[in-house]
Amino acid sequence: MLQPKRMKFRKMFKGRNRGLANGTEVSFGTFGLKAVGRGRLTARQIESARRAMTRHVKRQGQIWIRVFPDKPITSKPLEVRMGKGKGNVEYWVCQIQPGKVLYEMDGVPESLAREAFALASAKLPIKTTFVTKTVM
């Protein structure tokens, strides 16, 4: 599972997920999976989608993960009264804005990449679209 090795502070404010994304172009591979909606991806969802893609392309080509879960999400245990401080860190998420490239792929035919990204997209809670690298 992806998570930061060290952080200056253990817990974080909830914050808001507004604005536009950085990393909107396919830069490493030839094909990419781009977010259309906004939301947040957990480390488990990122890993699950990666496994689905890797298995479908039978470990040929190369896959890049362009997102990293760097925000801790806390929760309190069940049946605990309010107060007594913020809960413990339960999992890590990555906030996604529209236009962000989530995954990239290279070294496979376009048809295979489309199928792999469709499988990965089914594992994710946000709408995505298939994009290719634009050459100027």
Swiss-Prot record:
Family of the protein in this entry: Belongs to the universal ribosomal protein uL16 family.
Organism per entry: Shewanella denitrificans (strain OS217 / ATCC BAA-1090 / DSM 15013)
Molecular function GO labels: rRNA binding; structural constituent of ribosome; tRNA binding
Entry protein name: Large ribosomal subunit protein uL16
Gene behind this protein: rplP
Function of the protein: Binds 23S rRNA and is also seen to make contacts with the A and possibly P site tRNAs.
Superkingdom as given in the UniProt entry: Bacteria
GO CC annotations, alphabetized: cytosolic large ribosomal subunit
Annotated HAMAP family: Ribosomal_uL16
Coiled coil: none
Gene3D superfamilies in the cross-refs: Ribosomal protein L10e/L16
Record keywords: Ribonucleoprotein, Ribosomal protein, RNA-binding, rRNA-binding, tRNA-binding
Quaternary structure annotation from Swiss-Prot or TrEMBL: Part of the 50S ribosomal subunit.
Gene Ontology biological process terms, A to Z: translation
Family matches, as InterPro entries: Ribosomal_uL16, Ribosomal_uL16_bact-type, Ribosomal_uL16_CS, Ribosomal_uL16_dom, Ribosomal_uL16_sf
